[in-house]
């Protein structure tokens, strides 16, 4: 969609936003919502008349490392969030991805964008997603009404369900201002164990066996030989299963020794090399130079081999897997055919979700970038949208047509 003209409306707080939303309702207009616009490529192109800019919603409000809570405004840049947490040797456990290389954006964006898209990295497999760490928030709905959910205490579960609903809604239900997140201490150390495998099925099975052991891995990925080479790793097998262990030094060393003894061909990466490798996996840097579109596909790990085999029969593609095989990152040809084939393969292998992340051509004009909804789920989404935003003011159509 090419916009000829629109007004950029800068707001500094929720009272300003309420006035803008009230005016939009009166004029029967739609508003786009953005801060740094680093995730503007995700989802559909919203149908808006004017754009409300919330980048002024920025700054750390309260950080209590001893209580494991961080309160800040949603427009706070991620580099500021990360430096604040690093000052107390803490982190966001869901491991925020920085997709600026594949999205051709200037930075990792804001914490609000992270929450709006529920962006979660490799540790999601064991630690949960972004929505699981949002303790509370202050926001304004598409009705122009301010509301609060949750609180600032880790034990306080009030509002968690609403946090889970608003996270991942792409700004279609409400605009965040103040948010409170649960933080965690950084692990003392981390290492990675590399296990060569003959094929994808063997890699998935190997990882499943390790996760069934008492050795507490917290992340697992699978790299084909050519992708591993991009990360500077020479692989003897067709696939490389990667296991990450984190914790205190003595525990990590003991667990690694047991796993290496049980899997004779395993190789250990030290902490620095392990950290660098998982950053490349988290940020999808390993596909940044690939031609065509990039898709993110969520499925059952056991379904991954059949899905990849089906796609390789028809397309020239590159891929790797995160979340023990449950998250496939794929680079393939632009256009509708690749995405359609992916969704057909998903449907034939237990279902899942395929999302277009990088559109290198005009694929968004030809195929829905987010997984299409069943009629029942579409009706449910419509009802939720009507409850928060009955006039469809906020980011109308950003996720699904007509919502």
Residue spans of the language-model regions?
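N-terminal glycine-rich flavin-associated loop
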Residues: 2-33, 54-107, 115, 119-152, ...
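Structural motif
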Residues: 6-9, 29-32, 49-52, 68-70, ...
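Residue-level signal for inorganic ion chemistry
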Residues: 35, 75, 243, 330
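Short glycine-biased active-site loop of nucleotidyltransferases that positions the nucleotide triphosphate
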Residues: 40-46, 232-234
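Conserved glycine-rich FAD pyrophosphate-binding loop
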Residues: 45-48, 262, 266-403
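Short, conserved charged micro-motifs
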Residues: 79-81, 200-205, 249-257, 303-310, ...
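C-terminal substrate-binding/cap subdomain adjacent to the FAD-binding core in PCMH-type
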Residues: 116, 135-291
């Amino acid at each position: 969609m090419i916009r000829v003209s629109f007004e950029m409306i800068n707001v500094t707080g929720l009272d300003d936003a309420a006035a803008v939303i009230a005016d939009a309702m009166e004029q029967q207009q739609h508003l786009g919502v953005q801060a740094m616009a680093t995730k503007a490529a995700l989802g559909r192109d919203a149908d808006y008349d004017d754009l409300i800019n919330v980048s002024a919603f920025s700054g750390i409000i309260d950080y209590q490392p001893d209580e494991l809570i961080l309160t800040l405004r949603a427009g706070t840049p991620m580099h500021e969030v990360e430096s604040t947490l690093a000052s107390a040797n803490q982190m966001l456990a869901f491991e925020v991805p920085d997709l600026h290389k594949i999205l051709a954006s200037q930075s990792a964006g804001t914490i609000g964008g992270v929450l709006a898209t529920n962006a979660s990295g490799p540790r999601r497999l064991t630690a949960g997603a972004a929505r699981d760490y949002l303790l509370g928030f202050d926001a304004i709905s598409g009705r122009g009404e301010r509301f609060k959910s949750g609180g600032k205490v880790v034990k306080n579960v009030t509002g968690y369900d609403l946090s889970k609903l608003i996270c991942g809604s792409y700004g279609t239900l409400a605009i965040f201002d103040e948010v409170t997140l649960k933080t965690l201490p950084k692990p003392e150390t981390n290492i990675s164990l590399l296990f060569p495998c003959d094929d994808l099925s063997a890699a998935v099975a190997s990882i499943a066996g390790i996760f069934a052991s008492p050795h507490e891995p917290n992340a697992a990925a699978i790299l084909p030989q050519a992708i591993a080479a991009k990360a500077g790793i020479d692989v003897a097998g067709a696939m490389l299963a990667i296991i990450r262990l984190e914790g205190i030094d003595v525990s990590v060393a003991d667990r690694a020794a047991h796993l290496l003894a049980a899997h004779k061909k395993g190789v250990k990466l030290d902490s620095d090399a392990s950290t660098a490798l998982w950053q490349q996996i988290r940020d999808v840097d390993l596909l940044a130079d690939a031609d065509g579109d990039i898709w993110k596909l969520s499925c059952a790990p056991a379904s991954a081999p059949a899905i990849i085999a089906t796609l390789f029969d028809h397309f020239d593609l590159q891929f790797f897997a995160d979340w023990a095989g449950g998250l496939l990152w794929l680079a393939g040809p632009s256009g509708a055919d690749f995405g359609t084939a992916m969704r057909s393969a998903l449907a034939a292998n237990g279902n899942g979700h395929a999302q277009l992340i990088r559109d290198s051509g005009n694929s968004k004009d030809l195929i829905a970038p987010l997984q299409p909804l069943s009629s029942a789920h579409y009706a449910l989404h419509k009802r939720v949208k009507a409850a928060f935003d009955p006039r469809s003011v906020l980011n109308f159509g950003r996720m699904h047509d007509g919502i």
